[in-house]
Curated annotation (Swiss-Prot):
Record-linked Gene3D superfamilies: 3.40.1280.10
InterPro entries associated with the record: Alpha/beta_knot_MTases, RlmH-like, tRNA_m1G_MTases_N
Membership in a protein family: Belongs to the RNA methyltransferase RlmH family.
GO cellular component, one term: cytoplasm
Residues engaged in binding S-adenosyl-L-methionine: L76, G108, M127, S128, K129, M130, T131, F132
Function of the molecule: Specifically methylates the pseudouridine at position 1915 (m3Psi1915) in 23S rRNA.
Protein's recorded name: Ribosomal RNA large subunit methyltransferase H
Species of the source: Ureaplasma parvum serovar 3 (strain ATCC 700970)
Compartment(s): Cytoplasm
Keywords, comma-separated and alphabetical: Cytoplasm, Methyltransferase, rRNA processing, S-adenosyl-L-methionine, Transferase
Catalytic activity as recorded in UniProt: pseudouridine(1915) in 23S rRNA + S-adenosyl-L-methionine = N(3)-methylpseudouridine(1915) in 23S rRNA + S-adenosyl-L-homocysteine + H(+)
Amino acid sequence: MMIKIISVGKLKQKAFVDLINDYLKRINHYLKCQEIVVSDEPEPVQISNKSLEQIKSKEASKIFKNINQNDFVIALIIESNIISSETLAKKIQQWLNTFSHDICFIIGGSNGLHESIYERANYHLSMSKMTFAHGLAKVMLCEQIYRALSILNNGKYHK
């Protein structure tokens, strides 16, 4: 069992990449964690609702290639459950105790996630009602996963 953090689009900001890599190393101290980045689709100059759905559908197909049938999937979505760090820790513990497969956190690209990802997800999670830059959201997710595992293992990180 491991945690997979699946996101759409490669980050260009070195500062975000460095922070994510640091948190991934910390997470791996407690539980194996893998970062998976699927390529985002190019956007036409003038984007219609139809082409937006096609883009999200193609990105969803790439995401699904990295999810196994029995994986527990958490989709990040603004219009969803906002929970505390302590509650996330309890939920991760519950998921680890209940499911024998991987736990997958999914972060969409700039256009969000396709409806099929939301339908497949076992849980919807929001970090805030605010919108964050893609890289910042990924850093925040990694930090919260590390914090949750630190809480579960009585680490000194969470005070």
